[in-house]
Each structure stands twice: as C-alpha cells, then as structure tokens.
C-alpha cells in the first residue's frame, strides 16, 4: 500500500515515518499533515484508498498499527499489498470508516469472513459482536478447580475424553444407568411383579389363614436398585466436592436431574422402615399412592445419559436455543384448539349422534387433528363438522411447519460445531515439531489435560500452519528477478 499526500512528493517522503531530509517535523505540522495523508491498499489487484487517520482509530489492528502493516509495504509501487479476499475488504474498510460497525457481505461465506477478521486482527470484541449478529450462541466458560487433586477428580468425572480412566468411569456410569432403567421396566411385568404393595390377612378356601407380609429388603429388584443408588450417590458426592463452584453446581440442570434420580429411593426406604416399625395400617393406602408417584420420578434417570451422549446434548441445546419458536408454536396451537373446538361443537350441535358434548370435550379432538395424529375416537358426522375438521387438519400442518426451519437451523449449527470440535481434537494427535516439545506434548496428553490446554495446542497448531504457509509463499513469489520482493529479509508477503 502506498502512502500519498495531496502534493507530488517522492517515495521516501511519502512513506510514513520516513522524512526526506532526515529531520523530524514539528508535532503540530505532523498532525495537520496526517489529516490529509492517504494510504493505498492493494487487495489482490483491487486498490482501496483511505486516510491514515481512519486506520489510526484502531491502533491495535493490523492496518491501524504502522509497525504491523509495514511488513506488507511495497516500496516499488508505494502501496500495501495483501493477497486476500476482495469482497471481504469492503466490510473490513467500513469497520474503520464507521468506527467499529462490522457487517458481513452477503456474497462472502461465514467461515471465510471469520478468517479475514482474524487476519486483520480486529480483536476478540469485534469477533464476538460479529458472531452475535450472525446468530451464534456464546459458549459458556467451564472453569477448572484450582487445586491439582480436585482438578484430577473433576476431569475424571466431568470430561470423559480427557484420559483413559475417565472413559472407564463414563462407561461404568452408562452401564449403571441402563441397568437401573431396565430394572424399572422389568419390575412391572405381571410374571415378575410381586404384590409388594399388599400387607394383610389372606383367607384360603380350606379355611386356613395366612398372614402375608411383603419384605422389600429381600426383593431382588430392590437389591439391584440399591447398588445403582450407591453408585449414583458416590458419583454425585465426588463431583460436588471436586467442582470449582458449589453455587454453579446446583444451577446445572444435569446435577439437578442426578439429585432427583436418587431422592425416590431414600423416600421409599424411609417409608418402608416407618411402616414396618409403626404398623400403621390406616395410612397404608396413602403411603402406597405416594410411593407410586415417587417411583415414577425414577424414569428421569434416562436423562442422565445425556451427560455421556453428544447427540442428546445437541438436542438439548437445540431445544434451549429454540424456546422462542416452540413458545410461538404452542401459542398458535392453543389458538387453533380454541377456534376449531368451538366451531366443530356448534357444527355438530343439532346432530343426535354427535361425539362432541361440549367445547372442552372437543379440545382433545382439536389437538389430535391439528397434530395430524387422528385417533378416531372422536370424529364429526355432519357436513359442516367435516369441513371444520378439514380446515383444522390443514391449519395444523401449516402451524407446525412454520417454526421447523428455525429449529433445524439451530440443530445444524450445534451439530457442525460439535463435529468441528471433534475434528480439531483429532488433529491434536498429529505430531509436528513446530507445535511443542516432546516433554510438553507428553505432559498435555496425560490425564491432566484440561480444556484450556486443548485450546492452547490448537492455537499453536494454527500458528505453525500459518508460519509454514507464509514461508512457502515467500519462497514461491520471490525466486525470480525483477519481482516486487524488495529487501526480502524484512518484507513479508501474506496469503
């Protein structure tokens, strides 16, 4: 990029920071001259011209810092040359002209524009603001414990990919969860179900009396359930004492699910012990009803699998990011249910064989019709009712289809972010002499590797690749004579 002023001056005086006579002008004259001083930026053959004070608004960036941009100065053409993407630079230059507003051109891919932001060193603040405008969701930082022992334990139970023992613990946890869910389902089979809820006197046909008392402590299902609860409790307690923040521990929805998964067991155990000691038969029916509700909560243990399943985590993040669209969907369905249930009731009011005795009774029909399920237990029989039913089904299809693209877009975003993270993690296993020393790599590949160290290795890899590309391009562009590569030891060419 060349530096030019309004008057014709030679190249030595035109370059910033290089006065012609070797003496430096006064500060006031320098400030007045800087207001009019212009620079030329050549982006792959397309020249842009702007004032130097425009670039100086952001002195920490590549173009705003004279020392940084001087590497790309071509003294023969008196300009700064960048072999970068042309359409992207329109937005980059507007960032300086507007004082910090950054908008991606519609004809530039998202990943390419992100690379341009990094190359021109616009900063993390500009990158975060750009990602927010593009709809990216900021990842929450997950700090690690400060103490080494707590960090080791936290990585074992929270980061299954950090080491071999952590993977073993994750596999054991998944197996225990699956066993608990299988036991929860099998104990309801008629051939395996025992009348554990019955305590009393049984009169046989031969006039003999048998007192039947169920003992839950000898039940095989209860024994297996106890073993599962021991593991769940151990895992929860260890993770609680090893977590970096006790307050954030209880704010995590997954930890709340872990607590809910073990509470029913202790309530059931306490109720059984109280009944055996007190023998209060009058409260037996009430306690059994409570136990049935509490046992139902055990089914939430299946959500514990999401801690070890990337697919379930992606699904949960998608639903969380799509709460607004899901809320609109429920609101539209609510309006449709009220509208069509009222319409079908009055359309079928004069029919003796009508299935709709009231508007609330027609709510069920409207819901299954708008969701295109159609059980067939309730259906219109008149012409007017069938017309209302047809409109209800069509409206349901349109209502449900509206928010689906947004939800799918959110799912694709989280899915690609997860897959890209896995690909970057796989690249960490590729050996390179420019990344780190052997001792450093062996230390980072141990069981103490944290998420911050993963990011550090990734940054080293990107820097080494960028250095390798710059060396190759300089070699390729400066091998012949009469090239623009003047003073090769100082001038660098970017790709």
Swiss-Prot record:
Keyword Nucleotidyltransferase attached: no
Segments carrying motif Selectivity filter: 372-377
MF GO annotations: delayed rectifier potassium channel activity; disordered domain specific binding; voltage-gated potassium channel activity
Impact when changing residue 243 to A: Strongly decreases palmitoylation and alters current kinetics
Positions in coiled-coil regions: none
Effect ascribed to mutating residue 226 to R: In EA1; yields currents with a largely reduced amplitude
Topological region Cytoplasmic: 1-164, 243-253, 309-323, 416-495
UniProt note on regulation of activity: Inhibited by 1.1 mM 4-aminopyridine (4-AP) and by 20 mM tetraethylammonium (TEA), but not by charybdotoxin (CTX). Inhibited by dendrotoxin (DTX).
Bilayer topology annotation: Multi-pass membrane protein
Positions of region (S4-S5 linker): 310-323
Impact noted for substituting residue 446 to E: Impairs expression at the cell membrane
Organism expressing this protein natively: Homo sapiens (Human)
Residues carrying lipid (S-palmitoyl cysteine): 243
Disordered, as annotated region: 1-30
InterPro entries listed in its UniProt record: BTB/POZ_dom, Ion_trans_dom, K_chnl_volt-dep_Kv, K_chnl_volt-dep_Kv1, K_chnl_volt-dep_Kv1.1, SKP1/BTB/POZ_sf, T1-type_BTB, VG_K_chnl
Extracellular side: 187-220, 275-287, 346-359, 380-386
Tissue-specificity statement: Detected adjacent to nodes of Ranvier in juxtaparanodal zones in spinal cord nerve fibers, but also in paranodal regions in some myelinated spinal cord axons (at protein level). Detected in the islet of Langerhans.
Name of the protein this chain belongs to: Potassium voltage-gated channel subfamily A member 1
Name of a matching Pfam family: Ion_trans
Outcome of substituting residue 255 to Q: Strongly reduces channel activity, but does not affect expression at the cell membrane
Keyword Ion transport: yes
Catalytic reaction equation(s): K(+)(in) = K(+)(out)
Function text: Voltage-gated potassium channel that mediates transmembrane potassium transport in excitable membranes, primarily in the brain and the central nervous system, but also in the kidney. Contributes to the regulation of the membrane potential and nerve signaling, and prevents neuronal hyperexcitability. Forms tetrameric potassium-selective channels through which potassium ions pass in accordance with their electrochemical gradient. The channel alternates between opened and closed conformations in response to the voltage difference across the membrane.
């Amino acid at each position: 990029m060349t530096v030019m002023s309004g008057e014709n001056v030679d190249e030595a005086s035109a370059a910033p920071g290089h006065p012609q006579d070797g003496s430096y002008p006064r500060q006031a004259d320098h400030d007045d001259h800087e207001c009019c001083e212009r620079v030329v930026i050549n982006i792959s053959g397309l020249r842009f011209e702007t004032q130097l004070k425009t670039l100086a608004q952001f002195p920490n960036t590549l173009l705003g810092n004279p020392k940084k941009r001087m590497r790309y100065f071509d003294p023969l053409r008196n300009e700064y040359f960048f072999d970068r993407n042309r359409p992207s630079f329109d937005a980059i230059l507007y960032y300086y002209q507007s004082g910090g507003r950054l908008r991606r051109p519609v004809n530039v891919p998202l990943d390419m524009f992100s690379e341009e932001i990094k190359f021109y060193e616009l900063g993390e603040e500009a990158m975060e603001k750009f990602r927010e405008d593009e709809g990216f969701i900021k990842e929450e930082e997950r700090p690690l414990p400060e103490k080494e022992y707590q960090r080791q334990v936290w990585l074992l139970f929270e980061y299954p990919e950090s080491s071999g023992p952590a993977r073993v613990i994750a596999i054991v946890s998944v197996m225990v969860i699956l066993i608990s869910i299988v036991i929860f389902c099998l104990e309801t089979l008629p051939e395996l179900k025992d009348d554990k809820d019955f305590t009393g006197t049984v009169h046989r046909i031969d006039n003999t009396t048998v007192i039947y008392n169920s003992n839950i402590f000898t039940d095989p299902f209860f024994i297996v359930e106890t073993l599962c609860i021991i593991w769940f409790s151990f895992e929860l307690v260890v993770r609680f004492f090893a977590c970096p923040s006790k307050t954030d521990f209880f704010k995590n929805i997954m930890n709340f699910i872990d607590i809910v998964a073990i509470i029913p067991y202790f309530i059931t155990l306490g109720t059984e012990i109280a009944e055996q000691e007190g023998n209060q038969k009058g409260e037996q029916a009430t306690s059994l009803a409570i136990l049935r509700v509490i046992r139902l909560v055990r089914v939430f243990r299946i959500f514990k699998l999401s801690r070890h399943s990337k697919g379930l985590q992606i699904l949960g993040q998608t639903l969380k990011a799509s709460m607004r669209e899901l809320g609109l969907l429920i609101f539209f369905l609510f309006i449709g249910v009220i509208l069509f249930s009222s319409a079908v009731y009055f359309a079928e009011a004069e029919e003796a064989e009508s299935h709709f005795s009231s508007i609330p009774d027609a709510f069920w029909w409207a819901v299954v019709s708008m969701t295109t399920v159609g059980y067939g237990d309730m259906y219109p029989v008149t012409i007017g009712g069938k017309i209302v039913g047809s409109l209800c089904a069509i409206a349901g299809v349109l209502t449900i289809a509206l928010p689906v693209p947004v939800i799918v877009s959110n799912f694709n975003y989280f899915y690609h972010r997860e897959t890209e993270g896995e690909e970057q993690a796989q690249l960490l296993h590729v050996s390179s002499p420019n990344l780190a020393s052997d001792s450093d790599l062996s230390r980072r590949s141990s069981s103490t590797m944290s998420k911050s160290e993963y990011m550090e290795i990734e940054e080293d890899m990107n820097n080494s690749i960028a250095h390798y590309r710059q060396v190759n391009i300089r070699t390729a562009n400066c091998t012949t004579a009469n090239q623009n590569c003047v003073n090769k030891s100082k001038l660098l060419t970017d790709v």
